[in-house]
Amino acid sequence: YETDAQGKETMLTVKEKKIAAEIEKEEIQEEELAGEAIAENTKELPKPVKKSLYMILLSIFFWFAAYNAVTTAFSRYAVKVWGLEGGGFADCLMVATVAAIFSYIPIGMISEKFGRKKCIQGGLLLLLISYLSAAFFPVYHPAINIGFILIGIGWASISVNSLPMIVEICSLGDVGKYTGVYYTFSMAAQIFTPIFSGFLMQHISYRVLFPYACVFTILAMITMCMVKHGDSKPQAKKKVWEHFDVED
């Protein structure tokens, strides 16, 4: 009830059936739009896009095979080849890790300007130069740490941009599936490479380690050149700390 200025009470009524019908109509329209969006986003990828997806997945396998071989076998390599004792090898790995941490934000900014693919290719080039340089050191020298700084920067360039490229290539409805494929290839490489590289070092020489990493890095560079999709430049961040956001 509502009371007017003269003190009279008036009964207010609500057209419930009309409102209910409008609500039901809106819900049906929303469901139809959602269905159309799902159908659009779960369409099969075109062949050229699929090829790019397969090539970047192979690249992921190759660069993880190279990088993981170095990180898992470096302690033994440093002792057997360079004669480092007392855990001195840990300093090199620490240098690479710190370099990567300090590189993430600048690399995000570089990706905004030049694109993800070029940033990944630059990272692979840094890794190749570093692995190749390390292979020519007969004994440990402090200059080796420069190579490990480049390894950290190169690996950061790859890790910042690779998963976003997968997400960019796949359709919205398949993001979860292709993210799973990304981790399948990366983990498969990390299972394969310690076994295979370990076998080669045991039966040939520990000096095989860095040439081994070079070969797989070159393979990653070749397959990455065949990736033609997923290279849109990420949107520029308004704040510096937004570069820490993870896109998956």
Residue ranges and their predicted role:
Residues 1-57, 239-248:
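Juxtamembrane intracellular "pre-TM" segments in multi-pass secondary transporters
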Residues 125-139:
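C-terminal ends and interior cores of transmembrane alpha-helices
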Residues 199-217:
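A membrane-interface helix-boundary motif in multi-pass transporters
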Residues 86-87, 170-182:
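Loop-to-transmembrane helix entry/capping segments in MFS-fold secondary transporters
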Residues 143-157:
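Hydrophobic core of transmembrane alpha-helices in multi-pass small-molecule transporters
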